[in-house]
Amino acid sequence: MSTGAQTKAAAASQHADGPRLLADVGGTNARFALETGPGEITQIRVYPGAEYPTLTDAIRKYLKDAKIGRVNHAAIAIANPVDGDQVRMTNHNWSFSIEATRRALGFDTLLVVNDFTALAMALPGLTDAQRVQIGGGARRQNSVIGLMGPGTGLGVSGLIPADDRWIALGSEGGHATFAPMDEREDLVLQYARRKYPHVSFERVCAGPGMEIIYRALAARDKKRIAANVDTADIVERAHAGDALALEAVECFCAILGTFAGNLAVTLGALGGIYIGGGVVPKLGELFMRSPFRARFEAKGRFEAYLANIPTYLITAEYPAFLGVSAILAEQLSNRTGGASSAVFERIRQMRDALTPAERRVADLALNHPRSIINDPIVDIARKADVSQPTVIRFCRSLGCQGLSDFKLKLATGLTGTIPMSHSQVHLGDTATDFGAKVLDNTVSAILQLREHLNFEHVEQAIDILNNARRIEFYGLGNSNIVAQDAHYKFFRFGIPTIAYGDLYMQAASAALLGKGDVIVAVSKSGRAPELLRVLDVAMQAGAKVIAITSSNTPLAKRATVALETDHIEMRESQLSMISRILHLVMIDILAVGVAIRRAAPNAELAEAMARAKARAGASAGDEAADVLDWLSHGAAPAAKD
């Protein structure tokens, strides 16, 4: 973190896309900062969470106070598990959608990660001046590191070395069940059970846990204490020498040592255990003299093992900013450094060769890519201060057919910012929110399909379809829509095809199939027993089955080739939406594959196709090429006179 006047070197190292917003949001306070360049963290401000109705309100207040205009990228470390788009804080009343927050604040990128995952990413960069070793032990290089820290809650994480980088673990280990080690801790557990049905380590060795320990010990000694005594009061009394407060702190540190030892043996953390959070630093010498280290090593047969593992207290100021900055930098680097983002690199390479007007469109695409993707051409032209034809010329200068083609390529380069987890629709969502969630969920599912689809199976399926004597498409209920769409596409190849959505018709037709025939069975569940029996009959007669279904289903296991389309629906009881889209996409992939095969057929197939097309007065290759163009979102094939 830097202070003082900005040097020329610092100015040169500023982020090209502007300052980045960093946040560390806890149960009590929200801390914000700006990173103007790598390691240049400034304008740190702290806001009490209770004073703001929402996280968005707190961020807007910070941006206003910091007098910052546009921020493109932001990353938030939050004291809460982060699983999907919706975040509901455990130790505060804030609840928000990550994507809705990003849109409301106008960010291009908004990352939200667990605070201890962020803190973990800061550990490799800490210097000796930013940590204090507690007890003995020596850390082993390139070994697992453990992290814990009592604050409003008890955060837990870890770092695993992987080649030249570190992988941070997301964990809620603080909620592991508390296990007492002596009679005094038995008493604390019994007291806590009166209030909580499940007593986790977080209940007794997070900040509020010290109050529980203090009150449990007071009850043991039959001492009356004020109702408003909190952890800060207890720590202050302990520093002043109050016997009961000192015992509470001692007990607290011992329990913390037990938990740290558990974490060390669980992770095999030979790289050391680090202690963060806001409570322990306030204990000062009370912690250094406490039984923490002795309890850390007290693991019976593993005492020698733990004696060699060092424990450190983090003393760096605002270390979570360092970690969340590293995570954001890696995310943005992945976006711009991968093969999928070649369009960004091409824009940068071509920029100087563009006209001044086209250059303004290029700058808009680089700095605000979502604006290009989401806005109509009239808004893009207005924001870039150019004419609409200039926008089209810019796209063609990059080798794109037009604006739509450029938007598609640009979106591919932005996959790192598209949510890859499912966003739940909730009662009370506005049309903007639930509409965006439906679209995001669909896009996310398609991207995941692209990442996990077995393309060897796709090639096998295309070969089977291309050589089929007859193709029948079977789908029940909602899947019948997909079957009908497939029939509409494939009958144009000159192969006899039909689609059935009725079990009786499927059974009757399947009984007539044999070698050379193919059934494409479309099913979300892949478990309908009647459909499975129909397919068994056809396969026993020599027909082949291509299944478009979920993985590890009876249908996937029975099929000649399975094309697996796993996904998450919002509710099992409602009409399948995402699965239908994925199944339609699979049909498009298969149809394009067959069209490509038939656009350049071998001699034997060409002769067969020519005979099939003779009555239509079209050559096989021309017809297949027309269909390929149509499937590729070009013009529909012209009707033959």
UniProtKB/Swiss-Prot annotation:
<dbReference type="InterPro" id="IPR036388">
    <property type="entry name" value="WH-like_DNA-bd_sf"/>
</dbReference>
<keyword id="KW-1133">Transmembrane helix</keyword>
<dbReference type="InterPro" id="IPR043129">
    <property type="entry name" value="ATPase_NBD"/>
</dbReference>
<keyword id="KW-0324">Glycolysis</keyword>
<keyword id="KW-0472">Membrane</keyword>
<protein>
    <recommendedName>
        <fullName>Bifunctional protein glk</fullName>
        <ecNumber>2.7.1.2</ecNumber>
    </recommendedName>
</protein>
<feature type="region of interest" description="Glucokinase">
    <location>
        <begin position="1"/>
        <end position="340"/>
    </location>
</feature>
<dbReference type="InterPro" id="IPR000281">
    <property type="entry name" value="HTH_RpiR"/>
</dbReference>
<keyword id="KW-0812">Transmembrane</keyword>
<dbReference type="GO" id="GO:0003677">
    <property type="term" value="F:DNA binding"/>
</dbReference>
<dbReference type="InterPro" id="IPR035472">
    <property type="entry name" value="RpiR-like_SIS"/>
</dbReference>
<dbReference type="GO" id="GO:0005829">
    <property type="term" value="C:cytosol"/>
</dbReference>
<feature type="transmembrane region" description="Helical">
    <location>
        <begin position="576"/>
        <end position="596"/>
    </location>
</feature>
<keyword id="KW-0808">Transferase</keyword>
<keyword id="KW-0804">Transcription</keyword>
<feature type="domain" description="HTH rpiR-type">
    <location>
        <begin position="341"/>
        <end position="417"/>
    </location>
</feature>
<dbReference type="GO" id="GO:0003700">
    <property type="term" value="F:DNA-binding transcription factor activity"/>
</dbReference>
<comment type="similarity">
    <text>In the N-terminal section; belongs to the bacterial glucokinase family.</text>
</comment>
<feature type="DNA-binding region" description="H-T-H motif">
    <location>
        <begin position="377"/>
        <end position="396"/>
    </location>
</feature>
<dbReference type="InterPro" id="IPR003836">
    <property type="entry name" value="Glucokinase"/>
</dbReference>
<dbReference type="GO" id="GO:0005524">
    <property type="term" value="F:ATP binding"/>
</dbReference>
<feature type="region of interest" description="Putative HTH-type transcriptional regulator">
    <location>
        <begin position="341"/>
        <end position="641"/>
    </location>
</feature>
<keyword id="KW-0418">Kinase</keyword>
<keyword id="KW-0805">Transcription regulation</keyword>
<dbReference type="InterPro" id="IPR046348">
    <property type="entry name" value="SIS_dom_sf"/>
</dbReference>
<keyword id="KW-0511">Multifunctional enzyme</keyword>
<dbReference type="GO" id="GO:0006096">
    <property type="term" value="P:glycolytic process"/>
</dbReference>
<keyword id="KW-0547">Nucleotide-binding</keyword>
<dbReference type="Pfam" id="PF01418">
    <property type="entry name" value="HTH_6"/>
</dbReference>
<keyword id="KW-0067">ATP-binding</keyword>
<feature type="domain" description="SIS">
    <location>
        <begin position="461"/>
        <end position="600"/>
    </location>
</feature>
<dbReference type="GO" id="GO:0016020">
    <property type="term" value="C:membrane"/>
</dbReference>
<dbReference type="Pfam" id="PF02685">
    <property type="entry name" value="Glucokinase"/>
</dbReference>
<dbReference type="GO" id="GO:0005536">
    <property type="term" value="F:D-glucose binding"/>
</dbReference>
<dbReference type="InterPro" id="IPR009057">
    <property type="entry name" value="Homeodomain-like_sf"/>
</dbReference>
<dbReference type="InterPro" id="IPR050201">
    <property type="entry name" value="Bacterial_glucokinase"/>
</dbReference>
<keyword id="KW-0238">DNA-binding</keyword>
<feature type="binding site">
    <location>
        <begin position="23"/>
        <end position="28"/>
    </location>
    <ligand>
        <name>ATP</name>
    </ligand>
</feature>
<dbReference type="GO" id="GO:0004340">
    <property type="term" value="F:glucokinase activity"/>
</dbReference>
<dbReference type="InterPro" id="IPR001347">
    <property type="entry name" value="SIS_dom"/>
</dbReference>
<dbReference type="Pfam" id="PF01380">
    <property type="entry name" value="SIS"/>
</dbReference>
